[in-house]
A protein has these predicted regions:
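Surface-exposed, beta-sheet-biased, low-hydrophobicity segments with strongly acidic/polar composition
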Residues: 1-258
Length: 258
């Protein structure tokens, strides 16, 4: 179970360790427990909000039915309880922390997708992934991770590339190497690693602590292996000039199929 990591460091929550969904919570309770709030994505070890909510019993997943409080964005808070989790469906309920607007949802799991999506705002399922979860390789998105920038270590919302979790990609990278200087012989001689965030965000470096700062692109080439095929990737841009203003969020890269 993950939250929409595209919200960055806004969307987070806490496990109340309480099974009674009818318990009323207040904004004062949320503020008092702010330090207990965690993120929920699979790309950062400390972003494990829901990790202890499910357990295996007789080779099947079961829920401990703990109630979670989730801040979806400033001023929008919901409580969530997973009632049932099987290989084919998830049953959960959610509502406001004052016990209003409670909804119980049965979500049928699509085996062709890595994830199945639901909107608390619209109270409906959302189609996000392509119909076939093997039809894509990397996703460019925003996610939350712990990092140090300008002598400050904290959780940041970063933008980067994530491998398709439904595939078994391996990767490495070479610093100060042009993409055209890496051939198949060179790529196949390298030791590779497995990590969904193998490409991640570090191919660019923020050059200023202000929001209008520019990004410098690191001079590195990524080597990616999918099954027996090798690819190389080298990023060239993260910004784009639009109407005379430099806007971030437009990654460009070179690719070679070896």
């Amino acid at each position: 179970v993950i939250l929409n990591y595209a919200f960055g460091d806004i969307c987070k929550g806490m496990n109340t360790t309480n099974n009674n969904f009818n318990t009323t919570y207040t904004n004062n309770f949320i503020e008092a427990n702010a330090l207990k709030f965690k993120y929920a994505n699979q790309y950062e070890l400390n972003s494990n909000l829901f990790d202890n909510s499910l357990s295996y019993f007789n080779n099947e997943l079961s829920s401990n039915q703990n109630v979670f409080i989730v801040v979806l964005e400033p001023g929008r808070v919901r409580k969530i309880q997973i009632l049932e989790y099987t290989n084919t469906k998830v049953v959960f309920r959610h509502g406001n922390i004052d016990n209003t607007d409670t909804v119980t949802v049965t979500m049928t799991l699509n085996p062709n997708n890595n994830y199945n999506y639901y909107s608390f705002k619209n109270k409906d399922f959302v189609l996000v992934e392509p119909a076939n979860n093997t039809s894509w390789d990397i996703e460019f998105t925003k996610y939350t991770t712990l990092l140090t920038e300008f002598n400050s270590t904290k959780y940041y919302g970063v933008t980067g590339a994530i491998f398709n979790p439904g595939k078994k990609f391996q990767y490495t990278f070479l610093e100060n190497i042009n993409i055209n200087d890496v051939d198949l012989a060179k790529a196949s001689s390298l030791s590779l690693k497995t990590d969904l965030l193998g490409i991640g965000y570090s191919w660019k470096k923020f050059s200023s602590p202000t929001n209008d700062g520019f990004y410098a692109i690191e001079p590195r080439t990524y080597i990616v292996k999918d099954s027996s095929k090798y690819y190389t990737i080298q990023f060239t841009e993260f910004s784009k000039l639009i109407g005379g203003t430099t806007e971030k969020g437009y990654p460009q890269f070179l690719q070679n199929n070896l």
